């Protein structure tokens, strides 16, 4: 007996003749036949309902040989349980070709349900209205479909492989570009570092030369004045001494003394300018600061009643000065001032202000505490919560500190930049036109939140432009 036949025999032995499936909890009747416990009990229950009379109480006919067997004498068949389990775990190829319901060969294919069926299934109500074809025909049809699908998948695989190769090439190209850019950044910053070092040395040398020239002029003037002072002192002593002599002695050689006095008139030295020509300008600094630039907008509710705020994009006034302007607690009443809507308590911030002012128009720019006095005239100093640069007289721009350290400029700035580093406690002012540094406030920390601060002087003194808002005082 070959292996296939042996497997078939085992399947037959492990199959219940009632349910035509492998045994589940098999039991043996007194006549020696085996059935699933549930199958034989259901069969006998059905027989009990159909036949009210039995030849022997508690006995039922065997479904195989019809011999009566007492229901109590059903014995578990443990060996058959193991055989059924083995067959269930290792079905033969032929068993897989059998219908699980009817144990018939699967010779047909249901197109509607897309699964093989047997001849008995074909006649069932479930499959009778369905399109059914021989399984060989279905195999040929689906083989063609599978070939088409496989060909399509092969083409898609080729496309995927090409795309993968392209992406890998792109990745390598990208990494090479990043490498080159990283090296370029290193080189350029190294060059910039050298350039900045050279520029620093150039500025320091220019400043030193300017210092030496001015010091030499001032020292020369000082020496000349000192010499004149000594000559005048000697002549004064001679005159004092002559004044103490007798009248005749005093009048001797009076003409010579008086002529010497006339020749010793003070020679005033030429005025030496102490306006520094060497500008503190770091190349590229303004461009770096612009990376922190923000649109600062003046707050109309804080503006002095006669301070006009005009929004150029919206083409409208943000505030209309009039006698009946509401005077809230945030509005400035002592000076033509306003603060920005922004409140800064951290971070770095940069903004610019355009200056279109006339003559010696007074103004102030910077930051202030959010709780500064707005009703009373107080000095705009850090002690009062103001960190500003303001115009004093002529072209002198004084930081509002005590004592003030005026900065004299050749030309008034038409565009100023303000940089705030809150955590560092630093506020710096720049001429945005040429990038030169004007002044810095440096302290351990600011005492609290800050707001941009803008102040103008008398009417018709000019305008300030902050972002898209123009400020001026109504005349």
UniProtKB/Swiss-Prot annotation:
Reactions this protein catalyses: S-ubiquitinyl-[E2 ubiquitin-conjugating enzyme]-L-cysteine + [acceptor protein]-L-lysine = [E2 ubiquitin-conjugating enzyme]-L-cysteine + N(6)-ubiquitinyl-[acceptor protein]-L-lysine
SMART domains, alphabetized: BBOX, PRY, RING, SPRY
PTM description: Auto-ubiquitinated.
InterPro entries according to UniProt: B30.2/SPRY, B30.2/SPRY_sf, Butyrophylin_SPRY, ConA-like_dom_sf, PRY, SPRY_dom, TRIM/RBCC, TRIM17_PRY/SPRY
Pfam families assigned to the protein according to its UniProt record, in alphabetical order: SPRY, zf-B_box, zf-RING_UBOX
GO process annotations (BP): innate immune response; protein ubiquitination; regulation of gene expression
Main subcellular location: cytoplasm
Pathway: Protein modification; protein ubiquitination
CC terms in the record's Gene Ontology section: cytoplasm; lysosome
Zinc finger (B box-type): 94-135
Protein localization: Cytoplasm; Lysosome
Keyword Ubl conjugation recorded: yes
Zinc finger regions, RING-type: 16-66
Keywords noted in UniProt: Coiled coil, Cytoplasm, Lysosome, Metal-binding, Transferase, Ubl conjugation, Ubl conjugation pathway, Zinc, Zinc-finger
Enzyme Commission (EC) number: 2.3.2.27
Any one GO molecular-function label of the UniProt entry: zinc ion binding
UniProt: Zn(2+) binding residues: 99, 102, 121, 127
CDD domains reported for this sequence: Bbox2_TRIM7-like, RING-HC_TRIM17_C-IV, SPRY_PRY_TRIM17
Enzyme class: transferase
Annotated coiled-coil segments of the chain: 135-246
Function: E3 ubiquitin ligase that plays important roles in the regulation of neuronal apoptosis, selective autophagy or cell proliferation. Stimulates the degradation of kinetochore ZW10 interacting protein ZWINT in a proteasome-dependent manner, leading to negative regulation of cell proliferation. Inhibits autophagic degradation of diverse known targets while contributing to autophagy of midbodies. Autophagy-inhibitory activity involves MCL1, which TRIM17 assembles into complexes with the key autophagy regulator BECN1.
Family (UniProt): Belongs to the TRIM/RBCC family.
Assembly notes: Interacts (via coiled coil) with TRIM44 (via coiled coil). Interacts with TRIM28; this interaction prevents TRIM28 activity on BCL2A1. Interacts with TRIM41; this interaction prevents TRIM41 activity on ZSCAN2. Interacts with BECN1. Interacts with NFATC3 and NFATC4; these interactions prevent NFATC3 and NFATC4 nuclear localization.
Designated name of the protein: E3 ubiquitin-protein ligase TRIM17
Species this chain originates from: Bos taurus (Bovine)
Lineage: Eukaryota, Metazoa, Chordata, Craniata, Vertebrata
